[in-house]
């Protein structure tokens, strides 16, 4: 249900509270998922005019689950705080003394409902952490992470229901990876939603039993970061080793992701250096190049009155580790399909350790040695 539809059905006196929740409601680690409202109902009589819904179900993303809590206002007394019903979490009993925004409910503050929800989620987190005490292994995992502030302060835990036969229960740890994304080139972050939310990486680790015999990790990237790193298939995290623990595994994933980000940043600066060197070495021979992401370059060159194009198209995201392809194209000869005759070359002198100037010098020398055979092939296989 869209925010507009929701607000059109809510009692006007309660609308400011609900508007803050559905428009700005981001609670917990997963900033890509907002709070949602469903099951709008009214406790008013059928004679009450206009929109009168004053109770609803609030969907809250938490540790890879969706909590569904019922919130009940009284439209006849909109200045009073709401009641809460916690659905399947019947054993969750929040401490009222810790709910300051509920005990000091301020109906003139549109954010007061959202603030109460945030306080409740904090207590819910504490409740889930306390449930881990039933498993010494899971409690060890929690306590060792808690001792490291970069993990302990950015963690959500959900302990599943007990198996009636075995007495075992599963648990999921959701951690926000302490990785700096601020230096990723801006152009890589453009192709995304208007409001992409926070740039974040979340590691979910599910323990299917209390003894950690089955552990399944999964990495979630916010849309802009996933795009910047080359898509969902670009990053493969290692399996959780048998006998390992989270305090050893999580830093490995964090370092892997940090290295990936650094490759992207370094690749951008190396591509810029590469393009600058070609501009310097080939001057007026440069036809066009990508001045934003530095991913493409086209040269128009000649050898003994034979003119040809050289395209360095789509310099790899992880350049210089990945070698670019050079495509030679005759300006005179066509293939049977009407395309300019061309040959792609990747077998040329190259080292990722060279700087941009050395790469341009080596490419220039390679052009001189390769053009005669390319010209011969163009005359033999192309059409004028």
Swiss-Prot record:
Function recorded in the entry: Component of the BRCA1-A complex, a complex that specifically recognizes 'Lys-63'-linked ubiquitinated histones H2A and H2AX at DNA lesions sites, leading to target the brca1-bard1 heterodimer to sites of DNA damage at double-strand breaks (DSBs). The BRCA1-A complex also possesses deubiquitinase activity that specifically removes 'Lys-63'-linked ubiquitin on histones H2A and H2AX.
Organism for this UniProt entry: Xenopus laevis (African clawed frog)
Subcellular location: Cytoplasm; Nucleus
Designated name of the protein: BRISC and BRCA1-A complex member 2
Family note: Belongs to the BABAM2 family.
Keyword Ligase among UniProt keywords: no
Keywords linked to the UniProt accession: Apoptosis, Cell cycle, Cell division, Chromatin regulator, Cytoplasm, DNA damage, DNA repair, Mitosis, Nucleus, Repeat, Ubl conjugation pathway
GO molecular function: polyubiquitin modification-dependent protein binding
Lineage: Eukaryota, Metazoa, Chordata, Craniata, Vertebrata
Gene for this chain: babam2
Domain of life per record: Eukaryota
Stretches the record annotates as UEV-like 1: 30-147
């Amino acid at each position: 249900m869209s925010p507009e539809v929701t607000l059109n059905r809510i009692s006007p006196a309660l609308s400011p509270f609900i508007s803050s929740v559905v428009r700005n409601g981001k609670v917990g680690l997963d900033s890509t998922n907002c709070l949602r409202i469903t099951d709008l109902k009214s406790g008013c009589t059928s004679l009450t005019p206009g929109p009168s819904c004053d109770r609803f179900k609030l969907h809250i993303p938490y540790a890879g689950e969706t909590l569904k809590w019922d919130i009940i206002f009284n439209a006849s007394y909109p200045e009073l705080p709401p009641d809460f019903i916690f659905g399947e979490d019947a054993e969750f009993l929040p401490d009222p003394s810790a709910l300051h925004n509920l005990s000091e409910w301020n109906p003139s503050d549109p954010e007061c409902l959202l603030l109460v929800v945030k306080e409740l989620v904090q207590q819910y987190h504490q409740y889930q952490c306390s449930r881990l005490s039933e498993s010494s292994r899971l409690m060890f995992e929690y306590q060792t992470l808690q001792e490291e502030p970069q993990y302990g302060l950015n963690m959500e835990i959900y302990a599943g229901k007990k198996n009636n036969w075995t007495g075992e229960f599963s648990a999921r740890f959701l951690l926000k990876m302490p990785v700096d994304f601020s230096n990723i080139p801006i152009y890589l972050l453009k192709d995304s939603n208007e409001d992409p939310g926070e740039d974040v990486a979340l590691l979910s680790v599910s323990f299917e039993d209390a003894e950690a015999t089955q552990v399944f990790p999964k990495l979630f990237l916010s849309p802009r970061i996933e795009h910047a790193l080359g898509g969902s298939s670009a990053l493969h995290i290692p399996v959780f080793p048998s006998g390992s623990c989270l305090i050893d595994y999580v830093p490995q994933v964090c370092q892997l992701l940090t290295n990936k980000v650094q490759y992207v940043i370094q690749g951008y600066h190396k591509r810029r250096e590469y393009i600058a060197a070609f501009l310097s070495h080939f001057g007026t021979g440069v036809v066009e190049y990508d001045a934003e992401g530095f991913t493409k370059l086209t040269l128009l060159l000649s050898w003994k009155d034979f003119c040809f194009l050289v395209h360095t198209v789509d310099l790899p995201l992880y350049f210089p580790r990945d070698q670019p392809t050079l495509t030679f194209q005759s300006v005179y000869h066509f293939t049977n399909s009407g395309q300019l005759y061309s040959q792609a070359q990747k077998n040329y002198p190259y080292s990722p350790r060279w700087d941009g100037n050395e790469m341009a010098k080596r490419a220039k020398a390679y052009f001189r040695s390769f053009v005669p055979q390319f010209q011969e092939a163009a005359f033999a296989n192309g059409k004028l």
